[in-house]
Amino acid sequence: MALAKIVYASMTGNTEEIADIVASKLEELGLEVQVHECTTIETEEILDADLIVVASYTYSYGGDGELPDEIVDFYADLADLDLTGKVYGVCGSGDTFYDDFCSAVDDFDVMLGSRGATKGAENVKVDLAAEDEDIVNLEQFATDLVAKVNE
């Protein structure tokens, strides 16, 4: 059974809910899933996963989209890992009020791809909290990831 590790950062609970939606669908599709809040996992612990999912909100103090403080170390440590042979997906929440809507999702997409991992699904960006359409998109995201893992 393939192992998926989901690492998330959530301030308001919205991104944690996103991670839980993805985790539920991955489990339904037959993967073993471990969900970790980003401060409770060392970055190298993702190396035993077949699928890596990062879910992060974008912090926009003053309108400048930034990675949340609590996930910065995880992000920086990714630069030291070889993720060749791993499949990844990135999702997260943000606020469309800001020009940099969900830029943390884009940052993680670039980083994971640059470390040799294979993108398994298009990024999913959620405006604030997951609504019905977002849930459909997140479940499709999970389905696409499993298809890539099973190739």
Which residues does each PLM region occupy?
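Aromatic-flanked redox-active Cys/Sec active sites in thiol-based oxidoreductases
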Residues: 8-12
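FMN-binding flavodoxin-like domain, especially the glycine-rich phosphate-binding loop
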Residues: 2-3, 13-17, 25-29, 34-36, ...
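Short acidic loop-to-helix transition motifs that present clustered carboxylates
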Residues: 36-42
